């Protein structure tokens, strides 16, 4: 819950009134994280106690519907609880009294908060996506991105109504625990338990409380013990709130109060009608009940007898003053205003409700209080949701005292699903599957109500497929296909007219290795074919971990940064920050040459090539410095490109000039940038999703 607290404070401090938005607290289940490829052991590594300290990083991003626009990646507070994630907020634990609130064990989860963009009326686009990047290391292989469309993220309503039973059960568990402690319980806890028992009655239903309970009386514990608090029961119990019900209840309560006030005013008016003020009366300003009565008495011209004064000033004398001690003649309207003593009565420190008595007893038992304990002792809404990408569960949490979505202190505008409802109704009316299949008249009507649909409905070539829940996944696959197509074209172009493969990287060979060189030369075509098959068979997520994909990102980020103070660099640290400082810096992936051709490197190997690889002379290469000494090393990382007979190497520089290196340093060059054709909006969308801004300059350290 502390992560939710921190995100809420950050959201409240950085909130921009000109950009309406909301915040949603979620608990992503361990099953959902594991299905997304997150190793749970990495989230608790070095934390044997499973504490709140995190050794991972979480960032969030908002991705607009169809346009490809994204907000920059922003850090968010997060905490992983290995077990009882939902139970930790429904039944918190006092360290000195771990048996206070029994609960049914449940799964762990990640506490985090996601921003939700909306318009001034709170209307959000259900196809907008909230992206969450969880990284447990600096490498691309140590990060996963989870995507949540607003349609699956924002619940229809809260479920505070389902929490009433938990609060009553919490009170009863407290009473029984204090009764078991007996004389060892603090006096304040015993008194609170007695009040709670009296207020709940034998049936557990709140009953009117007596005016006082003897401090020496113990709590009356009756009935059978309550079952432990069950998170699963809470998630599946009926009791969903309705937006109209909450509004109606508040409206009815206000109307009842206003009706009572109106009746009281009418009654007073009938007894003491307001009379016209004489023109000769002195002017005066009255504040408070007694001043108003004095002014009314002075200017009304009515009788000034004791009975009349009794009626006018009954109960309104200043504290400590005798009633009508002076029976003198009439005074000016403002004469006695300064003699009226206005006092501030301090609020009583005595609890006035069962919840406040629970607060008193809890503080006495725990020796203090914490914000998360306080929020757990108030109403909590937990809504079970399902993640589209992993088909696993996550929970949307709302706290009564929260300013995030569903909180009773949430600031306007309130999130509205009006757009999602309108799209569903329009498609149902015309019996079409997707909104862009609607008739022109229906689309125009939607655009008049929701101008934000201009891009998805009217753009001739949207960056992402509109009205598609899987548009982000399809976009990544489309970029991978474009990159592979460009690589294939560049390799074919380089080998047309007879291959020019010679030893571009210098290595010395002995006479006994001539037979081996002939064997490698004979296998060149097979190795190339297997290399392309290995790349084509790479999953989209894994493809963006390769040296080729990272070089593409660096290339696009450098293009987007021309004329600007900042450029885009890949999110991970797989390639050194100074990779983009020189055309001589290359990032290589190594592939096996025996058996199946597989990529052997977890991250690219960065080298510096001294010399012109495009010329006829031989060049030399060396490793780039700056690799962390704590990074795990594979055997292949000990060899330079072409140095070992076991590896086929594919590398690129910042301009996407590639080098295919066979064993022995035999290589040919390719110009992949000439065949990679991405429209500017598409290239920008790729950069925003896979990169972050960084200040330009040589030797940049991110």
Swiss-Prot record:
Subcellular location: Virion; Host nucleus
Region named Disordered: 200-244
Oxidoreductase recorded as keyword: no
Listed Low complexity bias regions: 210-224
GO biological process entries: chromosome organization
Claim: Cell membrane is one of the keywords in the record: no
Subunit relationships: Interacts (via C-terminus) with capsid vertex component 2/CVC2.
HAMAP family in UniProt: HSV_CVC1
Protein name as annotated: Capsid vertex component 1
Organismal lineage: Viruses, Duplodnaviria, Heunggongvirae, Peploviricota, Herviviricetes
